[in-house]
Amino acid sequence: SSAASDVYKRQEYMRRALEVAEKGRGRVRPNPLVGCILVKNGKVIAEGWHDHLGGLHAEQMAIHDAEEKGHNTNGAIAYITLEPCNHFGRTPPCTEALLWAGINEVIVAHGDPNPLVRGNGISVLEQAGIKVRSGLLEKEAAEQMREFLHWCQNRRPYVTVKIATDSTGSVDDLSLEAQRFTSDECLERVHQLRKDSCAILVGANTVIRDDPQLTVRLVQTARQPLRVIIDPNNRVSPSAKLLNDGNPVQHLTENFRGLPALLDMLGDMEIQRLVIEGGPTTINYFLEDGLVDEFIPVSYTHLRAHETGRNL
């Protein structure tokens, strides 16, 4: 039926909006990923996404894209992954841009998670006579903005624990003196995970034993994550790489006040995702406090240090 094919088409358009939103990953925080598709007479005439902090919002970029291509946006339908903002932040409100462009219908995947503005953008559009529907592919949008939504609700980062497993799948005993290396593909995944996080946390033992860099080097990144070292007894050497490479670091010594306070502090710094790369001791502290949101297994292969010469 044509109603069913309409629903299917609408989902396809929203899927495309979610797809283009991904182009901003790692570049827009603390803002969420947002994508916008403009459709007119059954054809996609423009697309936009929030590309970098302080840059155009998705709706503004899509409208600009339509103009560049010589398309008239009057009477177009906008598919947007997140409810358009109605306040002046780093840029003017997107609701105004949509009104100005003559969009006559807006389809939204997910409402604004901020309770102060939730529903605001939608009601402003409706008052101006624009037809608004929301909730199309809402689950997919929520998954895409998972860390952002978690931070909005809890004012704390989403905590991911990286578990190192050996070739048999058992958890690596990180207390072994052996240097740990991974396959190239696996290393790249580790670096991608770092890029997608705002902060990386380790305990003193990991720093003392491995002297890691914990930076993103194998994939392109706009900025390095904050490295957090929990070291209440101040055992880490002042010459550790982490403390001397000029990248952001928080070395918590006698000022460490426990994990809940640490997560609150990181939340205040607008850190939305924290990856734990520490050993079993550090991971257990997080588990005991019930503070882990997700586990990611990374399989390590044991090689002797002279066979490959790289550190993490």
Q: Which sequence ranges carry the predicted segments?
A:
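Residues at the N-termini of beta-strands
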Residues: 105-106, 199, 273, 294
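Short, basic/aromatic recognition patches
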Residues: 13-27
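Active-site ligand-binding patch in enzyme domains
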Residues: 150-152, 156-273, 280-284
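Zn2+-dependent cytidine deaminase-like catalytic core
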Residues: 38-140, 285-287
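Conserved small/polar residues in nucleotide/adenosyl-binding loops
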Residues: 3-11, 301-308
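Short, flexible loop segments at boundaries between secondary-structure elements
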Residues: 227-236, 296-304, 310
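Residue-level signal for inorganic ion chemistry
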Residues: 17, 35, 85, 125, ...
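Short beta-strand scaffold segments in enzyme catalytic cores
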Residues: 34-39, 163
